């Protein structure tokens, strides 16, 4: 039976090796954490840094699951028309002023990189941390070395600032303290969604992304062991 791992390309495998190497160099050294990050990245970008894919061929019901209240005021015909225009769609779902951007900048700062960093404020923060102006040059987030360092910085900073009760809910005290992949996947998924997302919402997994990551994490553990 063919598995997800049987279908990984040479480029994907090379990128995984590079990401693991950089995690070790930058301080994420627990293979249980590393495998969870890889599992989440696998469903976000498949290890090829890229801009967020079009939703024009996505069922409206799934769009509603993903974007919730941001699209609830559109009826079916309106949502179908909206998703047919990528720029208009991303401006509608991401053009939120509270993230430091104007209503017509949602498309410009849509998801990019390995973990689909989104919103102008997140681009600025990620760029400032590595000394590159990602606000001016957002497509640079799709370059593997930049995407990898932004990915690692994102999770390291996220776990450093995580509320202690959030980490305790996943039986952890810091990013390298996980003892089970169930906890590490849950925490990494929660961090990627934002710690403001309740654990109950993470566990309910309306989009199926967490289940996908959980189904792959053990395979990534084995890959990491083989790289050692």
Predicted regions and their residues:
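Extracellular/periplasmic catalytic domains that process cell-envelope and extracellular macromolecules
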Residues: 29-33, 107-110, 178-181
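Active-site-adjacent structural elements in enzyme catalytic domains
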Residues: 31-46
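Peptidoglycan-targeting cell-wall enzymes and recognition modules
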Residues: 2-18, 42-157
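Helix-loop segments that flank and shape redox-cofactor active sites
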Residues: 20-31
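Acidic helix/loop microenvironments that form the catalytic cleft of cell-wall polysaccharide enzymes
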Residues: 41-45, 119, 165-205
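Substrate-binding clefts and substrate-entry loops adjacent to catalytic sites
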Residues: 123-142, 160-173, 179, 198-201
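Low-complexity, Gly/Ser/Thr/Pro-rich intrinsically disordered linker/tail segments
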Residues: 188-228
């Amino acid at each position: 039976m063919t598995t997800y791992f049987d279908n990984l390309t040479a480029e994907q495998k090379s990128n995984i090796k590079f990401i693991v190497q950089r995690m070790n160099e930058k301080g994420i050294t627990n293979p249980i954490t590393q495998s969870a990050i890889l599992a989440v990245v696998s469903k976000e970008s498949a290890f090829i840094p890229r801009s967020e894919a079009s939703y024009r061929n996505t069922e409206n019901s799934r769009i509603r699951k993903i974007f919730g209240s941001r699209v609830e005021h559109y009826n079916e015909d309106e949502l179908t028309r909206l998703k047919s225009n990528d720029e208009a769609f991303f401006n509608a779902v991401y053009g939120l002023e509270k993230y430091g951007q104007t209503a017509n900048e949602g498309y410009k700062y849509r998801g990019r990189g390995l973990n689909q960093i989104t919103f102008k404020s997140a681009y600025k923060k990620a760029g400032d941390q590595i000394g590159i102006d990602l606000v001016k040059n957002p497509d640079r987030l799709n370059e593997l070395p930049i995407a990898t360092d932004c990915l690692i910085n994102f999770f390291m900073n996220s776990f450093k600032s995580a509320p202690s009760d959030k980490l305790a809910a996943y039986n952890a005290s810091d990013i390298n303290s996980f003892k089970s992949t169930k906890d590490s996947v849950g925490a990494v998924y929660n961090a990627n969604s934002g710690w403001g997302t309740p654990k109950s919402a993470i566990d309910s997994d309306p989009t199926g992304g967490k289940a996908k990551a959980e189904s792959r994490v053990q395979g990534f553990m084995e890959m990491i062991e083989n790289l050692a």
